[in-house]
Regions:
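N-terminal intrinsically disordered/low-complexity leader segments
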Residues: 1-31, 216-221
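Generic hydrophobic, amphipathic alpha-helix propensity
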Residues: 32-40, 57, 78, 82-90
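Helix-turn-helix
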Residues: 35, 43-77
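An amphipathic alpha-helix signature
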Residues: 37, 107, 111, 115, ...
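Solvent-exposed, amphipathic alpha-helical segments
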Residues: 39-47, 89, 93-100, 181-189
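Hydrophobic alpha-helical connector segments
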Residues: 81, 95-122, 178
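Short secondary-structure transition hinges
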Residues: 107-112, 123-153
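Hydrophobic/aromatic-rich alpha-helical bundle segments in the mid-to-C-terminal region
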Residues: 129-133, 141, 161-208, 219-221
């Protein structure tokens, strides 16, 4: 599971440089790159990462293979960029929800974040095949930290800024454990039901609600 704060509380982008060989400078080039990413996302759901190739991505996107290599060195780089796009979309959607809704505390915010994760898993092409990159590479978001550690850092930033928690190493550990546990349970929910077993999703929320209060109470500012 990947939990991130609103854009206002973001603790920074993933530290790994963009996998793009170069940034598109014209609107037409930017649209072409977006078509490549859309094609990659669709194909991931249809055929999986192992069968994915730059040739198939080019064919689906309706671009020349040379155009693909102009921006990406290989299929992993394209997949990495799809993952980054998913992260940014997730941040934006959670941020919009936080602006529109009032929460009594961090526990309701966590429920909302889980709800956004579940909705993206159901509706966003490529998301169910990648999650946040762990299916392809545990270090897809950052070469030095595994993907869930990166996402836990985002949630930590939210707790520090929005809910008055004191910074500490223990807080880092508590949030990372919550993210790893929630991730495992949500994956179980989608293994049992392609749309996500609602009972298991509810259990994931209860699990985090039960664990974090005991861990976070010593760190309240």
């Amino acid at each position: 599971m990947s939990l991130v704060p609103t854009p206002q509380t973001d603790t920074g982008d993933c530290s790994e440089p963009t996998p793009l060989r170069r940034q598109p400078t014209q609107r037409r080039s930017a649209r072409r790159v977006e078509r490549m990413l859309d094609a990659c996302a669709d194909l991931l759901d249809e055929i999986g990462y192992e069968a994915l190739s730059t040739t198939r991505i080019a064919d689906r996107a309706g671009v020349a293979i040379g155009s693909v290599y102009q921006f990406f060195p290989d299929k992993r780089a394209i997949t990495q960029e799809v993952t980054r796009r998913n992260v940014e979309q997730f941040v934006s959607r959670v941020g919009a929800r936080f602006l529109e809704e009032d929460y009594r505390g961090w526990w309701e915010a966590v429920d909302a974040i889980i709800d956004e994760y579940v909705d993206m898993h159901r509706t966003v092409p490529g998301f169910k095949s990648l999650h946040f990159g762990d299916v392809v590479d545990l270090n897809l978001l950052d070469s030095d930290s595994d993907n869930n550690t990166v996402i836990a850092g985002r949630l930590r930033g939210l707790l520090l800024k929005e809910y008055g928690l004191a910074d500490s190493h223990e807080l880092d550990v508590a949030v990372l454990v919550a993210v790893e546990a929630g991730d495992a349970v949500l994956k179980l929910a989608f293994r049992r039901d392609p749309d996500g077993d609602t009972e298991i999703i509810s259990a994931a929320k209860q699990l985090i609600r039960g664990f974090l209060p005991r861990q976070l109470s010593p760190f309240r500012g």
